[in-house]
Amino acid sequence: MFEKAKEFMPGGVNSPVRAFKSVELDPIFVKSAKGSKIKDINNNEYIDYIQSWGALILGHSHEVVINAINEQSQKGTSYGLCHPLEVEMAQILVENIPSIEMVRMVNSGTEAVMSAIRLARAYTKRDFIVKFEGCYHGHSDSLLVKAGSGALTFGTPNSEGVTKEFVSKTIVAKYNDVQNINEIFENFGDKIACVIVEPIAGNMGVVPPKPNFLLTLRKLTKKYNSILIFDEVITGFRVSQNGAQGLFNVIPDLTTLGKVIGGGLPVGAFGGKKEIMQLISPQGPVYQAGTLSGNPLTLAAGVSTLKFILNNKNFYKKLDELAKTLEEGLLYALKDFNIKVNRVGSMISFFFNGSSVDTYEKVISSDVNMYKKLFKYFLSYGILLPPSPFESLFISYAHTNEDIQQTIDIAMKFSKNLKEGKV
């Protein structure tokens, strides 16, 4: 199937990580999925810790979501007009995400971030933006940059086709480095339109913020009249019903959302203070539009997902308990191999470098070959991890204690076989 796919699609995939290139395997092709499990086209079944990269917090094909999609599909799949689900979703987001007073739906996290940055530039009438190395905010040109050689180095393209001139307005800072971001603002503060950050980094593995890191960003952006944007595409409704901003009690000016709020269908949203959001067209001069924005199928899936979460008071407690059990089990099983597990709620990643991992430099020092061995071994025993050492595992509401224990048991077998030279 992969060879055929490569005839018609670049690299045989529609998103690079799906190619399994980082783990040096051909990708699996999914036939079906239910709950915590997926089945490939050869009828092999796996416990799935990808869960559509965190979008499926209820698990695959949850009855509530499927019923909502089926019901809406009978009423229409797309209108290009206003409909009640848009208002219902907006109200849920405003009532639960502390920073959001008004919100606009879009079709992806990339689109949400792109629009939020345009809005921040319009509001501040400044051009420069600050992002952090290791944080991913979609594939818009201004954010496809790497750090360069110095703390204050302006961005250089990290993708062919992105011009140096375009990303010259992007400053790349060091994640979790308070001194570095202070220096950036001392030098460029009056030029900075916004700072965008994953409040919990989730695209270089899971890297939680150090104490006072987010608060420092909040204080600096207020001092210099810049906009603070939290990219909560992963963390929104994942780590708490109030997102990471509620978890850490640091409230940004704008927030981007995605994944969970779409119930597994394509989605994005950005929102924030009314004063800022009222600049968006048609109310204001900042243009943003989308044919499928607020799509009724997506919002049916999303609203049903969020209602399920909000109506189950022990929802996050269950996820946390499952994730904690997995964290402790992996630490014990792989304790002889320099493993470090990072976890926030139901987001987990592990690194093989024997030390705490709280910066981009420490992330990339992890033993990627060890991860490849682990991935291949787990896959052979029906456990599907992310096919990259720098992505998060996600626990869903559908995962069971049995799933977690089976995963830990396989980790124990891997450890034993590795010691005996059988892996």
From Swiss-Prot:
The modification N6-(pyridoxal phosphate)lysine is found at K259. The keyword Cytoplasm applies. One of its GO terms (molecular function) is pyridoxal phosphate binding. InterPro entries: 4pyrrol_synth_GluAld_NH2Trfase, Aminotrans_3, Aminotrans_3_PPA_site, PyrdxlP-dep_Trfase, PyrdxlP-dep_Trfase_major, PyrdxlP-dep_Trfase_small. It catalyses: (S)-4-amino-5-oxopentanoate = 5-aminolevulinate. The keyword Isomerase applies. GO terms for cellular component: cytoplasm. It is an enzyme of class 5 (isomerase). Pathway: Porphyrin-containing compound metabolism; protoporphyrin-IX biosynthesis; 5-aminolevulinate from L-glutamyl-tRNA(Glu): step 2/2. Its main location: cytoplasm. Signal peptide: none annotated. Transmembrane segments: none annotated. GO terms for biological process: protoporphyrinogen IX biosynthetic process. Pfam families: Aminotran_3. NCBIfam families: hemL, PRK00062.1. Homodimer. Belongs to the class-III pyridoxal-phosphate-dependent aminotransferase family. HemL subfamily. This is Glutamate-1-semialdehyde 2,1-aminomutase. It comes from Thermosipho melanesiensis (strain DSM 12029 / CIP 104789 / BI429).
